[in-house]
Amino acid sequence: MATSQPTRVLVVAHKTAATPSLLEAVRERAAKGPCTFTLLVPKRAHGLHTVVDAQDQSPDEAREVIELAVPLLEQAAGGRVESLIGDHEPLAAIQDAINLQGFDEIILSTLPARVSRWLKLDLPSKAGALGLPLTLVTAQAREEA
């Protein structure tokens, strides 16, 4: 399908939003052709979810992640990067973003398997089942934020 519109890429990350491996993936995607990027950071879990996951962030952490990561992502992308704070459940956040704004591709950035909640939840497979091309980026141990 030929189109003159740039490809809309949803970048989903939290603790890995400013890691070298994600920045490189954005740089590589930008080099493939016209595209726009939006960083989606799932917000803090609330209620019992915070008891279950003791490493959950403060209420403002998603905003802080965006403030840190967006300038670095813009540099890697060679242009403006939009940002969203999504639902605390990452798959719901991805579905909401796709349904409300429409995206053509997903770049999903996770921590290494030994510490990644998203990998334990099988988020890459679930997000891939949404029917969009998905690139999985896993941070290296030394990159962890």
Predicted regions and their residues:
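Glycine-rich, Arg-bearing micro-motifs that act as flexible, cationic patches
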Residues: 110-125
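A short acidic, amphipathic alpha-helical/loop segment
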Residues: 22-25, 96-97, 122
